[in-house]
Regions:
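N-terminal secretory signal peptides that target proteins for export/translocation
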Residues: 1-9
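Bacterial N-terminal signal peptides
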Residues: 12-24
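Extracellular, modular beta-sheet/disulfide-rich ectodomains of secreted and cell-surface proteins
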Residues: 24-113
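Hydrophobic/aromatic-rich, well-ordered segments within soluble, folded domains that form packed cores
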Residues: 62-80, 134-144, 543-555
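Short amphipathic alpha-helical segments with coiled-coil-like heptad repeat character
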Residues: 75-85, 143-152, 336, 407, ...
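Beta-propeller domains with acidic blade repeats across secreted/periplasmic ectodomains
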Residues: 114-521
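Long, ordered, helix-rich scaffold segments
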Residues: 477, 490-629
């Protein structure tokens, strides 16, 4: 009882420190926002409040700036406050016998900024900054009076850009010559909320909603030959999640399969192929999960956000990897490796389980450790994989590798990631590290107002592509905000001819990546030869190799490798194989697991090995709770 009370005090103290340090991020200014108390009070019906945080409901006093609704209210003697970002919905239900009283409601800039003073579309180089030798141009502004706000982008076989929109708005197609718009047209494809778009040859794939609000993977063909792509077929429905926490980007893999990243509210497809590599997942946390205090994601079980792999007909689905939160976009580098840019849960700031926004390497069968509420895994859990590059805070949206850009070689190899909240387009520079990568990052494009005393310049980036002209194009928009298309070119003195993708490949780490791929290829079917091949790699110093070897071994019946695991005396190999046994073995195996672990005194182990040993104990007691009291 005292321990629980102390924990609560500690968590509150940590949260308070975080709020103090973060300063204006959580604040709003009364002068810059609109008092909407009367509107919110009028929305209370039958002692219940349901209201959308939307520019259509409230006056938009800060065009182009993301906003939030803040409501202070009282239930009985308790004074409370709730916040919801623009585009969301606030619901407050009061227990029987108590009354809801709205004290104050404010709708205004989410980060406490002043209303828009600078429009990046007018003179981008005056209010935006980029690296030496690069130039930013404004290309096109949306018709905001019609509510068009661009949230995704792709390139068709003719090099035209397709700009996807939100809230019932259509797709815009833009034809460019020398970076100038010569034609922009509205397409009549009956799909909106297009958060994923991809051309494969002359076929357009979309993730979005149809006229009935059903979220699906669509295939659009130009069967009439009139450039309309009006032959629309639903290949797969995405259940559970929709929109911003739904199915997002679609990319074509080196294997000519579609890789589709889904947010944490999408249900795992119920038709997974037997070859599906990500299996046997759970919360697997010793402390009972504390759900989010506002109920966001409460009750949703692992695997969290995931990447699905399907064929070009949307069939033969596999759960390729998981344990992300709400990744919006993914991309393959020139080595054929898949990377994503995952979000945080900003309401967790200050709590021990907070996970910052980060770049991750998605490998076959990988688990990146996201769970809902307080159940998020620390990076050291051996049954997960670590972050590649930790960024900090932000709102991840579109990504692209610089392959094909007319940039210096360093920036052709870079991984470009969009931050919607802080208006940053960052360049991540990845370097091989064993069978994976590590990385550093820098701001490639950002508002000068991020560090200068000036009026805020909204630059809520949504997506990014490399055009056929070698320029980088990015869009801003989302949640009804003003949308624009920008172009970045290199005008410096360094060589900038596009380098073929094959010449951008990394020789460093190639043998380790090849070994990892070989082990991953064994995580498909039962093969009696797999255990003998993979076993030596359980003791590899590379965590990615050990992970792939364990997953390959787990594909085979426990009876084929149980005794080897219990007899293993090399620490890494023992703990990795015993982790597999803890995950998949029968409960009665647990005493033997504990006995094997006792063969490794703590003073003989490295810190990493001690954590691996602890993880085996944790998973074993969680999955066989009746054996150890």
């Amino acid at each position: 009882m005292l321990r629980n009370a102390g924990t609560k005090v500690l968590f509150r103290a940590i949260t308070l420190v975080a709020l103090v340090l973060s300063g204006p991020v959580f604040a709003y200014s009364a002068e810059d926002a609109t008092n909407v108390t009367s509107v919110v009070m009028a929305a209370v019906k039958d002692n219940k409040l349901t209201i959308a945080a939307d520019n259509g409901v409230f006056t938009d006093t800060a065009p182009g700036i993301p906003k939030k609704l803040t409501v202070e209210y009282r239930i009985g003697d308790e004074k409370l406050k709730r916040e919801v970002n623009e585009g969301g919905k606030l619901e407050i239900v009061v227990p029987d016998g108590q009354k809801l009283v709205v004290i104050k409601a404010v709708y205004g800039p989410a980060d406490g900024s002043t209303p828009q003073q600078n429009d990046a579309s007018i003179a981008p180089m005056e209010v935006l900054e980029t690296l030496p030798g690069f130039t930013i141009e404004h290309v096109l502004k949306s018709e905001r009076t019609k509510g068009v706000s661009w949230i995704s982008m792709t390139k068709d076989p003719k090099g035209r850009l397709l700009l996807g929109a939100q809230r019932g708005q259509p797709i815009t197609r833009v034809t460019l010559e020398n970076g100038k718009v010569v034609k922009d047209e509205t397409m009549s494809i009956p799909v909106t909320e297009t958060m994923g778009m991809l051309f494969v040859d002359n076929v357009l794939y979309l993730n979005g909603a149809d006229a009935d609000g059903k979220y699906c993977l669509f295939r659009c063909k130009d069967t009439k030959g009139d450039d309309s792509y009006g032959d629309v077929e639903s290949l797969r429905e995405w259940r559970g999640g929709a929109g911003e926490h739904g199915a997002h980007a679609i990319v074509l893999g080196p294997d000519k399969m579609l890789y589709i990243v889904c947010g944490n509210f999408v249900d795992v497809p119920n038709d997974l192929a037997p070859t599906s590599p990500h299996r046997s997942y759970g919360d697997d946390l010793a402390l009972k999960r504390a759900e989010d205090g506002n109920g966001f994601g409460a009750g949703r079980q692992p695997p969290g956000g995931f990447i699905a792999r399907v064929d070009l007909d949307g069939k033969n689905a596999e759960l390729y990897s998981a344990g992300e939160r709400n990744t919006y976009d993914i991309a393959f580098n020139s080595d054929g490796e898949l990377f994503g840019w995952d979000s945080d849960m900003e309401w967790d700031w200050g709590n021990p389980w907070y996970r910052p926004v980060h770049v991750f390497h998605s490998v076959r069968g990988g688990d990146n450790g996201f769970r809902e509420g307080s159940a998020k895994w620390p990076e050291y859990y051996a049954d997960s994989l670590p972050q590649t590059t930790t960024i900090g805070i932000g709102c991840p949206t579109g990504v692209v590798f610089g392959t094909g850009a007319k940039f210096p070689a360093k920036y052709q190899k870079a991984f470009y990631i969009c931050d919607w909240t802080y208006g940053r387009l960052m360049a991540v520079h990845l370097s091989p590290k064993g069978a994976s990568y590590t990385g550093t990052f820098e701001n490639f494009v950002a508002p000068k107002s991020l560090h200068a005393k000036a009026g805020k310049t909204p630059l809520n980036l949504t997506d990014v592509v490399i055009g056929d002209d070698g320029a980088l194009y990015f869009t801003i928009g989302g949640r009804g905000t003003a949308a624009s298309l920008f172009r970045v070119t290199y005008t410096g003195t360094e060589p900038a001819a596009p380098i073929p993708a094959s010449q951008l490949q990394e020789n460093e780490g190639r043998s380790a990546r090849d070994l990892r791929h070989k082990l991953e290829s064994l995580n498909v079917n039962h093969d009696p030869s797999t255990v003998a091949f993979a076993w030596p790699y359980l003791n590899n110093s590379d965590r990615y190799i050990r992970y792939a070897a364990r997953m390959a071994i787990e594909r085979n019946p426990v009876a084929e490798w149980k005794e080897k695991a219990l007899a293993e005396m090399q620490p890494h190999a023992a703990f990795t194989s015993l982790l597999a046994l803890a995950r998949l073995g029968a409960p009665e195996t647990q005493p033997a697991i504990m006995k094997s672990l006792s063969s490794f005194p703590l003073d003989t182990l490295t810190e990493e090995q001690m954590l691996e040993q602890l993880r085996v104990i944790e998973v074993s007691t969680l999955r066989s709770p009746a054996v150890v009291p």
